[in-house]
């Protein structure tokens, strides 16, 4: 899908992108999973080559941040959650050339959707491609900050469940949720660090106008403030995981202790019953009129004796 936007009084407005409408007036070309015809149109009308899927997947810095005859290129991660609430990072290719911003991505992303909604009612300050790029990065950082806050909130709820829970199913569910939150936190951190690298490259290589240079530095400061919070999330997750595993081990030990005590308590009565169950010819107790009730009483006493002993030693 191809979308194009132009500036009118420093405010983004969408261009109709039918075949008859040229793209030359667009300041922002946004492509989501473009087909061959859309790629060819951008190439023929604007002379811009677009990144391929293998190029989007490259992770080395030289393939993600570079400048060539086709413009300034930045490939950056954007965080998303799909319909099934599975988190991930999707690479977006940014290219700035001749005062125009090209964005190429493989899916719809929350940061882009939020920025387009804001752009309907907010005017840009300088109205250039660099400001567009930095505004998108700024929206991304806001989204990541919200995600960190959501993880904090979820961890607080899990902390109460783990510290107050007394059922094994609660701990199992808590461990599963903790693993999921740790995965989300790792993806958020990866996105923050990747954005930090992209902005550092932009500050070093691009001749940013004064307003955009300060904007880039402000976003970098925001990232620096978020990274320690993100790191503390991992510490909290690890603590809660260890606490949950500790409580699970305590519960398992309690169950094992119960079975051990039961087996020890029933071992002496079993020995008594086995003794009187032997078929020898000379067993005087067999002829006693109180032999059977006496054996039953003996078995009960044999079971009570170790139980009372364990109680006295506070082993139960």
Swiss-Prot record:
Transmembrane intervals: 255-273, 288-310
A Gene Ontology molecular function term for this protein is: nickel cation transmembrane transporter activity
**One GO term describing the cellular component:** plasma membrane
**One example of a Gene Ontology biological process annotation:** magnesium ion transport
Cellular compartments annotated: Cell inner membrane
Task: Quickly give the catalysed reaction.
Answer: Mg(2+)(in) = Mg(2+)(out); Co(2+)(in) = Co(2+)(out); Mn(2+)(in) = Mn(2+)(out)
User: Ranges in the Cytoplasmic compartment?
Assistant: 1-254, 311-316
Q: Which domain of life is it from?
A: Bacteria
Record has Cell inner membrane as a keyword: yes
Instruction: State which ranges are Periplasmic (membrane side).
Output: 274-287
Give the InterPro entries listed for this entry: CorA_cytoplasmic_dom (IPR045861), CorA_MIT (IPR050829), CorA_TM1_TM2 (IPR045863), Mg/Co-transport_prot_CorA (IPR004488), MgTranspt_CorA/ZnTranspt_ZntB (IPR002523)
Identify the residue position(s) of the site Essential for ion permeation: 253
Q: Which UniProt keywords apply?
A: Cell inner membrane, Cell membrane, Cobalt, Ion transport, Magnesium, Manganese, Membrane, Transmembrane, Transmembrane helix, Transport
Its membrane topology, per UniProt?
Multi-pass membrane protein
Q: How does it assemble?
A: Homopentamer. In the absence of Mg(2+), interactions between subunits are weakened, and dimers, trimers and tetramers can be observed in vitro.
Family recorded in the similarity comment: Belongs to the CorA metal ion transporter (MIT) (TC 1.A.35) family.
Q: What does this protein do?
A: Mediates influx of magnesium ions. Can also mediate cobalt and manganese uptake. Alternates between open and closed states. Activated by low cytoplasmic Mg(2+) levels. Inactive when cytoplasmic Mg(2+) levels are high.
Name of protein: Magnesium transport protein CorA
Q: Which organism is it from?
A: Escherichia coli (strain K12)
């Amino acid at each position: 899908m191809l979308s194009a936007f132009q500036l009118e009084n420093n405010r983004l407005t969408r261009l109709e992108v039918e075949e008859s409408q040229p793209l030359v007036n667009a300041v922002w070309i946004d492509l989501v999973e473009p087909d061959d015809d859309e790629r060819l149109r951008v190439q023929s009308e604007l002379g811009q080559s677009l990144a391929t899927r293998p190029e989007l997947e490259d992770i080395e810095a030289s393939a993600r941040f570079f400048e060539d005859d086709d413009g300034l290129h930045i490939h950056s991660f954007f965080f998303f959650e799909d319909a099934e609430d599975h988190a991930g990072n999707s690479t977006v290719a940014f290219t700035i050339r001749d005062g125009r911003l090209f964005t190429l991505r493989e899916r719809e992303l929350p940061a882009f959707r939020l920025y387009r909604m804001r752009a309907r009612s907010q005017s840009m300050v300088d109205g250039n491609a660099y400001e567009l790029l930095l505004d998108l990065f700024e929206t991304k950082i806001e989204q990541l900050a919200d995600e960190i806050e959501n993880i904090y909130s979820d961890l607080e709820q899990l902390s109460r469940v783990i510290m107050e829970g007394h059922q094994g199913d609660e701990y199992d569910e808590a461990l599963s949720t903790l693993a999921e939150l740790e995965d989300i936190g790792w993806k958020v951190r990866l996105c923050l660090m990747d954005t930090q690298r992209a902005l550092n490259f932009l500050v070093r290589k691009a001749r940013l106008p004064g307003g955009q240079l300060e904007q880039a530095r402000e976003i970098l400061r925001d990232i620096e403030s978020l990274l320690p919070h993100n790191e503390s999330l991992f510490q909290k997750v690890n603590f809660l995981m260890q606490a949950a595993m500790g409580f699970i081990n305590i519960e398992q030990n309690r169950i094992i202790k119960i079975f051990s005590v039961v087996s020890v308590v029933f071992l002496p009565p079993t020995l008594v019953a086995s003794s009187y169950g032997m078929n020898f010819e000379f067993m005087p107790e067999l002829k006693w009129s109180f032999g059977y009730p006496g054996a039953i009483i003996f078995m009960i006493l044999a079971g009570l004796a170790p139980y009372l002993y364990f109680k006295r030693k506070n082993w139960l």
